[in-house]
């Protein structure tokens, strides 16, 4: 089967070209390519072609909470958002702390076939922070687990974290830390600041995140290990990351679209959809995060896609489960916050949403150059078409988007996974 993408601009640059995909690879790039008789032609005149997006941080809820999301609906949302590979966090039921669970998640992703679903293995048994899991067995299993995290919980015991980093280094895998000192966040539901004080909400201090980021940078330095920081949310974290990188410490970090765009002023409505961990911070933090992404201090954008059913969100703010949808809106939010103001080019978007996450995770066939012979994991974006977000109109089984009724720029018009069209015109095969 052949697919011809007609009239695209690679990375949004240069002249319009046609891109011919044959089988699983890019077969030809040029102007006026003859259309094979059997080709599926996608007219994408003056649209942007990017390598398929890669998300290091999602919650697909399977196994255990399929009422909120499952691998099929999550994969559909990912494909419609331009993603070709996603990483599913281990806070499922049961926890993904053994090859039984991680291999199940991998196989389910393969069955659905819309994106490559890579399970993230737990660092500690049951996410309890005490006993290390058999990371080697998960890395050697069918899923070949590349990233380990207790996300949702912090590996807060420094000795356990140091042992995890040492173990991971020997296996050639990565530890991703949910940076939260739990003794500073007991009962916290909102950023600690004037807004939380005025609204009577228990505050989550910046220091809860920053203290763990600093500690883990030092642990990684001493262990000669890599460490990845999940969902950076404060200006102070940016400064610590900058210092650590200047010292030659092997540390990478991600930021979510919602922390780039939103701030804690939204909490005035007491709408549970705005509760998220780490919490929405102040405007100054969002500005610092945007600049850090532009400067390369923060390496990549991840969604932290966290579906929750209505009965888990439509409650009083402090009782709402934390998390937001993100897979279908991420690219548009990045365009809004980073491309429109001139902080990033489309080529930069490819770097922070495809190339860097693929490199961090060690995915050899994603985040590749747009060249002949490369895998046809591709995303086509119309930069000139806006769309209005509605939770009910998203592919996820849940509707907890913080962007309800917002009009966002840029629309994904097609996604290809190894040459197979997995989304087209905001429709998915699922």
Swiss-Prot record:
Identify the keywords attached in UniProt to this record, alphabetized: Hydrolase, Metal-binding, Pyrimidine biosynthesis, Zinc
EC class of the enzyme, as a word: hydrolase
User: Can you quote the record's cofactor note?
Assistant: Binds 2 Zn(2+) ions per subunit.
Query: Which gene is transcribed and translated to give this protein?
Result: pyrC
Recorded hits in SUPFAM superfamilies, A to Z, give: Composite domain of metallo-dependent hydrolases, Metallo-dependent hydrolases
Single GO cellular component term: cytoplasm
Instruction: Show the InterPro entries listed in the entry.
Output: Amidohydro-rel, DHOase, DHOase/Allantoinase_Hydrolase, Metal-dep_hydrolase_composite, Metal_Hydrolase
**What is the source species?**
Mycobacterium leprae (strain TN)
Family, as annotated: Belongs to the metallo-dependent hydrolases superfamily. DHOase family. Class I DHOase subfamily.
Please give the name of this protein: Dihydroorotase
Tell me yes or no: is Metal-binding among this UniProt entry's keywords: yes
Catalytic activity as recorded in UniProt? (S)-dihydroorotate + H2O = N-carbamoyl-L-aspartate + H(+)
Look up the domain of life of the source: Bacteria
């Amino acid at each position: 089967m052949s697919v011809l993408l007609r009239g695209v601009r690679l990375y949004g640059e240069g002249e319009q070209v046609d891109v011919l995909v044959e089988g699983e690879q890019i077969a030809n790039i040029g102007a006026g390519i003859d259309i094979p008789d059997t080709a599926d032609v996608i007219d994408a005149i003056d649209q942007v072609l990017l390598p398929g997006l890669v998300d290091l941080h999602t919650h697909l809820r399977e196994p255990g909470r399929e009422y909120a999301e499952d691998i099929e609906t999550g994969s559909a949302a990912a494909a419609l958002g331009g993603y070709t590979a996603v990483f599913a966090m281990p806070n499922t039921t049961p926890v993904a702390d053994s090859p039984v669970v991680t291999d199940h998640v991998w196989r389910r992703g393969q069955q659905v076939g819309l994106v490559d679903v890579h399970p993230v293995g737990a660092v500690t048994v049951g996410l309890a922070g005490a006993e290390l899991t058999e990371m080697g067995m998960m890395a050697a299993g069918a899923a070949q687990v590349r990233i380990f995290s207790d996300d949702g919980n912090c590996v807060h015991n420094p000795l356990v974290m140091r042992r995890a980093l040492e173990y991971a280094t020997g296996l050639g895998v990565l530890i991703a830390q949910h940076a939260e000192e739990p003794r500073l966040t007991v009962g916290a539901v909102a950023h600690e600041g004037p807004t939380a004080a005025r609204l009577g909400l228990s505050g989550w201090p910046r220091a809860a995140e920053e203290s763990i980021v600093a500690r883990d940078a030092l642990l990684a330095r001493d262990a000669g290990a890599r460490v990845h920081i999940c969902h950076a949310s404060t200006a102070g974290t940016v400064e610590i990351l900058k210092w650590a990188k200047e010292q030659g410490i092997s540390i990478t970090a991600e930021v979510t679209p919602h922390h780039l765009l939103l701030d804690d002023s939204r909490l005035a409505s007491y709408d549970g959809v705005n509760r998220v961990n780490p919490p929405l911070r102040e405007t100054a933090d969002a500005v610092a995060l945007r600049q850090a992404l532009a400067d390369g201090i923060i390496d990549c954008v991840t969604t932290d896609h966290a579906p929750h059913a209505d009965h888990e969100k439509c409650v009083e703010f402090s009782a709402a489960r934390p998390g937001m949808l993100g897979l279908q809106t991420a690219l548009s939010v990045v365009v809004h916050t980073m491309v429109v103001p001139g902080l990033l080019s489309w080529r930069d978007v490819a770097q922070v949403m495809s190339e860097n996450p693929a490199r961090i995770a060690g995915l050899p066939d994603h985040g590749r150059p747009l060249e002949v012979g490369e895998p046809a994991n591709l995303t086509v974006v119309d930069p000139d078409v806006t769309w209005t977000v509605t939770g009910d109109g998203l592919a996820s089984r849940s509707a907890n988007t913080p962007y309800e009724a917002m009009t966002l720029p840029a629309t994904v018009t097609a996604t290809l996974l190894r040459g197979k069209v997995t989304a087209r015109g905001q429709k998915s095969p699922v």
